[in-house]
Amino acid sequence: MKLHELQPAEGSRHTRKRIGRGIGSGTGKTAGKGHKGQNARSGGGVRPGFEGGQNPLYRRLPKRGFTNISRKEFAIVSLDALNRFEEGTVVTPELLKETGVISALRDGVKVLANGELTVKLTVKAHKFSGAAAEKIAQVGGTTEVI
């Protein structure tokens, strides 16, 4: 086989369906839209969720829940992400943002116990999960709630 003999695998390529190009094409005249009716018109069809006038599902089901206006969204940091820092470093939310561990400070930083920590650090954050605080202490590090 030579480079000029390369061909796509059999059945992997399809020719484009050209509609409205004569009756010999199989999709001429009405271009696959049938005769008259709402769907045959330009811009025709029903909106998403329309069920022919029957009360649609999204209106049959009751509303649920609410949006808590005082909800706090914390930036999440996993323990294994803290391994990039040198031993003895004081890890602050500002340092985490500078180094690209988190993209935005949001309403604070929460440290979770995903992965293992191998470096002794002083970690300052707004919240710690119980397991994360335990793992930091095991390595000899300290936690400080801001």
UniProtKB/Swiss-Prot annotation:
Span list, region Disordered: 1-58
Gene3D superfamilies in alphabetical order: 3.100.10.10
GO biological process: translation
Keywords: Ribonucleoprotein, Ribosomal protein, RNA-binding, rRNA-binding
Any one annotated GO CC term: cytosolic large ribosomal subunit
SUPFAM superfamilies: Ribosomal proteins L15p and L18e
GO molecular function: rRNA binding; structural constituent of ribosome
Xref: PROSITE patterns: RIBOSOMAL_L15
Compositional bias (Gly residues): 21-31, 42-52
InterPro entries reported for this sequence: Ribosomal_uL15, Ribosomal_uL15/eL18, Ribosomal_uL15/eL18_sf, Ribosomal_uL15_bac-type, Ribosomal_uL15_CS
Basic and acidic residues bias locations: 1-13
UniProt function note: Binds to the 23S rRNA.
Homology family: Belongs to the universal ribosomal protein uL15 family.
Classification via PANTHER family: 50S RIBOSOMAL PROTEIN L15, LARGE RIBOSOMAL SUBUNIT PROTEIN UL15M
Subunit structure: Part of the 50S ribosomal subunit.
Name of the featured protein: Large ribosomal subunit protein uL15
Species whose genome carries this gene: Brevibacillus brevis (strain 47 / JCM 6285 / NBRC 100599)
Upper classification of the organism: Bacteria, Bacillati, Bacillota, Bacilli, Bacillales
